[in-house]
């Protein structure tokens, strides 16, 4: 299926780019190109001396990026956790003026049944961001134990019925001639295993999220990107990060908070504020930003988005 038919509305477009405080001649990284909404807006704010490097794991995102004919722009087919390697290869370590990350799954990925991310559309159970490498969700489910699956569902989906669902999935795969291979097939098995239904949320929501996060090592990728951001950024370089679920947002929030706190010193000790702040690597910029009611109405998928911004000292 050609995913160009799937409309993608970039979430918190202006807020995330404004958070970078773009310098016209600066060097920026869009770590999650997607369909290019943030990248195109960044390019519109750069002078001829400015530069934008984008990364993405999705081959279809790379194809979209290759349609941008602009000498200031380049795309690299890799995960955003590899940004330090990209910068090192380009001689840009410590010279980046801003990094933007828009975490999670894009609308084209969700809406294309062939990608296997959605429990609302029937398609092959894939879920890989990069379809050129790694195990698909179906391949992993065919070999996972009930205990390991329950751990994934609990850890990455905060699923209260993790053990029941895991047992149902593994039992089905052991007894059936044909193992689970379709999205709606898995969604139905999960729905049948859940004893209490939330009328506001599909019973497979948390399980699909958890399996997707595990298959793509999403939290590991984010952890690596956060830990390396300080070495990549130039002084006063900005981090602008949009997350879509509590696990991601908690990681981003804790990272920014931890790296923006000074030393704990005894009360009354004569020490200058400049000395206290000398070894604080980050400054948090403003409060967390959520989509407006108007944006949520225009794009309901933006509802859970949270934007956090920080600046390297």
Curated annotation (Swiss-Prot):
Gene Ontology molecular function, alphabetical: rRNA (cytosine-N4-)-methyltransferase activity
Localization annotation: Cytoplasm
GO terms (BP aspect): rRNA base methylation
Keywords per UniProt: Cytoplasm, Methyltransferase, rRNA processing, S-adenosyl-L-methionine, Transferase
This protein's GO CC annotations: cytoplasm
The keyword Protein transport appears for this protein: no
Pfam families: Methyltransf_5
Residues annotated for S-adenosyl-L-methionine binding in this entry: 36-38, 56, 80, 102, 109
Main location: cytoplasm
Reaction(s) this enzyme catalyzes, per UniProt: cytidine(1402) in 16S rRNA + S-adenosyl-L-methionine = N(4)-methylcytidine(1402) in 16S rRNA + S-adenosyl-L-homocysteine + H(+)
E.C. code: 2.1.1.199
NCBIfam families: 16S rRNA (cytosine(1402)-N(4))-methyltransferase RsmH
PANTHER family, alphabetized: 12S RRNA N4-METHYLCYTIDINE METHYLTRANSFERASE (PTHR11265:SF0), S-ADENOSYL-METHYLTRANSFERASE MRAW (PTHR11265)
Family: Belongs to the methyltransferase superfamily. RsmH family.
Role, per record: Specifically methylates the N4 position of cytidine in position 1402 (C1402) of 16S rRNA.
HAMAP family with a match to the protein in the record: 16SrRNA_methyltr_H (MF_01007)
Protein name: Ribosomal RNA small subunit methyltransferase H
């Amino acid at each position: 299926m050609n995913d160009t038919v799937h409309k993608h509305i970039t979430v918190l477009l202006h807020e995330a780019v404004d958070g970078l405080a773009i310098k016209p001649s600066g060097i920026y990284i869009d770590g999650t190109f997607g369909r290019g909404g943030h990248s195109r807006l960044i390019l519109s704010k750069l002078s001829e001396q400015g530069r934008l490097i984008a990364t993405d794991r999705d081959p279809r995102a790379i194809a979209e990026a290759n349609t941008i004919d602009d000498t200031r722009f380049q795309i690299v087919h890799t995960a955003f956790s590899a940004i330090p390697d990209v910068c090192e290869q380009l001689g840009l370590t410590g010279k980046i003026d801003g990094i933007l990350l828009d975490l999670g799954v894009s609308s084209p990925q969700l809406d294309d049944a062939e990608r296997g991310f959605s429990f609302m559309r029937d398609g092959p159970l894939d879920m890989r961001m990069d379809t050129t490498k790694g195990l698909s969700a179906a391949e992993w489910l065919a070999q996972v134990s009930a205990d390991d699956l329950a751990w994934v569902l609990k850890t990455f989906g905060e699923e209260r019925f993790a053990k029941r669902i895991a047992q149902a999935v593994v039992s089905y795969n052991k007894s059936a001639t044909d193992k689970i291979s379709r999205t709606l097939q898995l969604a139905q098995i999960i729905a049948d295993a859940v004893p209490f239904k939330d009328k506001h949320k599909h019973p497979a929501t948390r399980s699909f999220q958890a399996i997707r996060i595990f298959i793509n090592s999403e939290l590991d990728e984010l952890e690596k990107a956060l830990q390396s951001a300080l070495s990549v950024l130039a002084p006063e370089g900005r981090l602008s990060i949009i997350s879509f679920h509590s696990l991601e947002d908690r990681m981003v929030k804790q990272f920014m908070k931890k790296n923006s706190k000074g030393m704990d010193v005894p009360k009354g000790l004569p020490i200058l504020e400049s000395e206290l702040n000398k070894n604080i690597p980050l400054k948090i910029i403003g409060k967390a930003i959520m989509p407006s009611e108007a944006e949520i109405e225009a794009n309901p998928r933006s509802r859970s988005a949270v934007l956090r911004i920080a600046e390297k000292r």
